[in-house]
Amino acid sequence: MGSDWSVRTLAIVAGRPEGVGQPANVPIVPASALGLGYSREDGTPTWVALEEAVGRLEGGHATAFASGIATVSAVLDLLPAGAEVAVPSDSYVGTRAMFDHAERMGRLRCRRVTPADTGAWVAAAGEADLLWLESPTNPSLELIDIPAITAAAAGRAKVVVDNTFATPLGQQPLSLGADIVVHSATKLIGGHSDLLLGLTVAAEEELAAQLRDARTRGGATPGALEAWLALRGLRTLGVRYAEASRSAALLAERLGKHAAVTRVRYPGSGAMISFELAGPDLADRLCEHLRLIRHATSLGGVESSLERRAARPGDAHVPSGALRFSVGLEDPEDLWLDLAQALDSLD
């Protein structure tokens, strides 16, 4: 396999069967045991192909899990009791819930850091056992200076980066010095809102082995169908990411010019936009007036969706008028017509 191929090409070819007489695509292998080994320990050919592919894209050793949140559990399983973890104050609600629960149970201590405060992250790197980064953050799309933080943490704290929003097409955190990358493949990697699956990618094989052991102990193994669906989604990630990025950039620019919109956050690439209205009532009314864009949770699918995260349990810190917009593959002009009519209805 070409070592100089782009990430977009690798997303299509990595992990596929090789050799005469092999199928063009990886088959679904619904096996609970392979010879003398349980598949929950060693995986199935379907998992292995997905892990090989994502590992190639991220530049490390991948392990598939039953869900994105299961990857958080596996990382926590690596920490001794009483460990200190630095986490962003704005991040995925499920991740924060996991850390909050572990802290309440006395398993670890959490230091909550403002995402863009690089100085605070650098200080934490000298004291914490693990730094959990998310860039862009969910749902506010704040950016974290990964290279500066990994440089400060080198030889001290382990650095984990949730790369769900950026995907390997947008950034490869292991190349920036991170130790572990995690993904909710439920989102952009799968891309069709039809699966639950998570992935870790470790820079070192020893660390990957520890994560695989955590998966086995916790029983957080993915189904064969889910692994196959995630691999199928990965094959089109390049074109989906590029198209969604083009549409999102256009829509972010237009949203920024609309009188009803008070703030727009867009990191320059990717499918996610965060924008704010003057208050929760206006945001709720906008959601009610949408015709094409789905008012729904989750993100990263071929269909566009929008949600007011502050209305959801655990996200009260998010501005009350903020809306998280996942841009899909519909015609961007149709998406804008839908947004514009909903925004205009607020007058």
Give residue spans per PLM region:
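N-terminal "arm"/small-domain region of PLP-dependent enzymes with the aminotransferase-like
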Residues: 1-53
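Conserved PLP-enzyme active-site core in the AAT-like
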Residues: 2-3, 13, 17, 62-260, ...
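PLP-dependent enzyme catalytic core of the Aspartate aminotransferase-like
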Residues: 8, 122, 146, 240, ...
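Pocket-edge structural micro-motifs
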Residues: 14, 30-34, 66, 308-310, ...
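Conserved glycine-rich beta-strand-loop-beta hairpin in the small C-terminal domain of fold type I
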Residues: 29-31, 35-37, 248-249, 265-274
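Short loop segments at secondary-structure junctions
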Residues: 33-34, 202-207, 234, 276-281
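Glycine-rich loop-to-alpha-helix module at the N-terminal edge of alpha/beta enzyme cores
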Residues: 49, 53-57, 63, 70-71
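Conserved C-terminal alpha-helix-loop-beta "cap" of PLP-dependent enzymes
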Residues: 267-323, 327, 340-341
